Amino acid sequence: MVLDLLKSGVLLAVLASFTFSVMNALVKEASATLPAAEIVFFRSAIGTLLIYLLMRQAGVALSRQGVPMLLVRGVMGALYLVCYFYAIAHIPLADASILAHMSPFFVILFSALFLGERIPRAVYWLLLVVVLGALMIVKPFSYSSYSVYAVVGLLSAVFAAGASVAIRQLSARHHTYEIVFYFLAVATLVAIPLMWNDFVVPATLREWGLLLAIGVVSLLGQVFLTRAFSHESATIVAVTRYIGIVFNAGWGWLFWSEVPDALTIAGGVLIVVACIALSRTKKG
């Protein structure tokens, strides 16, 4: 019965969202004493080792073709992690999660710019709704440190979209494990100069435990997500993943007493509704 459940794309997408939300909570806890770039380094280094072992077990070899695009995907993914973890450390989990979930719209824009894909007219109206929702969350006219951190969270969606467009170019010729390996290996290297001046040696078993858990849990979430896409359409998986916002809000409320304000809730609703409508537009 468990095996049958694990063949449900929707359930796997929910599990992936839940697992990534756990990772986000662990990142927020670790960021109390460790810099975001350092967390990215350990998360990526541990993940690189684990995915390499999976590649060995599955007999997947590193190819010599398409390396430049693999590196682009890796850099985009690395910058996504740095921005997202930095945002998680400074703003509520729900806010960071909502902003990161804006990536589908940037995927549409990048696909039009770099892949020559046509943007349906309806998407322009949905984009306006998303921009309005983002402004309600970022609050650019409040001139507070929160707004700066929220902009960094928004940048995480931009870099995530860049990574997604690169994956679309790579997935036809490269195994998923290889794409993930390059992402994690490059992220490990990118994190080194970013953490160089602020590196803090983890001093307690608790800090080491958090870093190890982040690496393992994030890879587990990646496996769930990959399996979800193999058992269900990309549209259904993408829509289902918005439940991750609820999970993140739950952890934020439970452990850090984070309660989103009215503007954030309203902006989040606009973004989620617009993104679901976008998925239906793409499906149509």
Swiss-Prot record:
The subcellular localization recorded is: Cell inner membrane
> What GO CC annotations are associated with the protein?
membrane; plasma membrane
EamA domain residues: 8-138, 151-279
Keyword annotations from UniProtKB, A to Z: Cell inner membrane, Cell membrane, Membrane, Repeat, Transmembrane, Transmembrane helix, Transport
In which organism is this protein found? Pseudomonas aeruginosa (strain ATCC 15692 / DSM 22644 / CIP 104116 / JCM 14847 / LMG 12228 / 1C / PRS 101 / PAO1)
> Topology versus the membrane, per the UniProt entry?
Multi-pass membrane protein
**Consequence of gene loss (knockout):** The deletion mutant is susceptible to treatment with AMS and shows decreased intracellular iron content after incubation with AMS. In vivo virulence of the mutant is attenuated.
Q: What does this protein do?
A: Transports the metallophore pseudopaline, which is involved in the acquisition of nickel and zinc, and thus enables bacterial growth inside the host, where metal access is limited. Is probably involved in the export of pseudopaline. Essential for iron acquisition during the interaction with airway mucus secretions (AMS).
Predominant location: membrane
Q: Does the keyword Cell inner membrane apply?
A: yes
The name on file for this protein is Pseudopaline exporter CntI
User: Where would you find the membrane-spanning parts of this chain?
Assistant: 2-22, 34-54, 74-94, 96-116, 122-142, 147-167, 179-199, 209-229, 236-256, 259-279
Q: Which Pfam families match?
A: EamA
Give the record's family classification. Answer: Belongs to the EamA transporter family.
Regulation: induction? Is part of the operon cntOLMI that is negatively regulated by zinc level through the Zur repressor, which leads to transcriptional activation of this operon under zinc depletion. Highly induced in response to airway mucus secretions (AMS) treatment.
